[in-house]
């Protein structure tokens, strides 16, 4: 079965993102296809490369990045939500005159069209 996941919670402070990550791992382990994860609202904080958890805490931002690298799962970030929350790639940083970017490698700024496409091409969309 083909799945897409929508994450609306930040990497830390709520259970949404970590539950979504565990669900993603379980899907892959059970042989399902996870085509994409779409980060929306506060979920865009999962793509902030400046997140720095304590050494004894799980690094969820890097875990999402590894999921992308190992399994080819698309990690799409809502561009409007990201810009409102200060998560930008190099292109947007330059366009907005910002000193630097902070989008973690493996994540892609995209519009709601990416979510719509995932919804149309998947058997199930699960929101956290």
From Swiss-Prot:
| GO CC list | cytosol; sulfurtransferase complex
SUPFAM superfamilies reported for this sequence: DsrEFH-like
Query: Its Enzyme Commission number?
Result: 2.8.1.-
Provide a GO biological process annotation: tRNA wobble position uridine thiolation
Consequence recorded when altering residue 122 to S: Reduced activity
| Location of the protein in the cell | Cytoplasm
Annotated active site: 78
Q: Which UniProt keywords apply?
A: Cytoplasm, Transferase, tRNA processing
Q: Which GO molecular-function terms appear in the entry? A: sulfur carrier activity; sulfurtransferase activity
Which InterPro entries does the entry mention? Answer: DsrEFH-like, Sulphur_relay_DsrE/F-like, Sulphur_relay_TusD/DsrE
Quote the annotated effect of residue 78 to S: Loss of activity
What Pfam family does this protein match (any one)?
DsrE
The parts of the chain that form a coiled coil are none
Please give the function described in this protein's UniProt entry.
Answer: Part of a sulfur-relay system required for 2-thiolation of 5-methylaminomethyl-2-thiouridine (mnm(5)s(2)U) at tRNA wobble positions. Accepts sulfur from TusA and transfers it in turn to TusE.
Q: Which family does it belong to?
A: Belongs to the DsrE/TusD family.
Assembly, in brief, is: Heterohexamer, formed by a dimer of trimers. The hexameric TusBCD complex contains 2 copies each of TusB, TusC and TusD. The TusBCD complex interacts with TusE.
Protein name, UniProt field: Sulfurtransferase TusD
């Amino acid at each position: 079965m083909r799945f897409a996941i929508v994450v609306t919670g930040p990497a830390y402070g709520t259970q949404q993102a970590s539950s979504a990550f565990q669900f993603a791992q379980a899907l892959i382990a059970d042989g399902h296809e996870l085509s994409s994860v779409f980060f929306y609202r506060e979920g865009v904080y999962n793509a902030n490369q400046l997140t720095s958890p304590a050494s004894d805490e799980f690094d969820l931002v890097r875990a999402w990045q590894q999921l992308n690298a190992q399994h080819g799962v698309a990690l799409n970030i809502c561009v409007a939500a990201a810009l409102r929350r200060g998560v930008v790639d190099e292109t947007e940083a330059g366009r907005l005159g910002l000193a630097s970017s902070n989008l973690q490698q493996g994540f892609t700024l995209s519009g709601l069209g990416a979510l719509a496409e995932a919804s149309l091409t998947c058997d199930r969309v699960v929101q956290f």
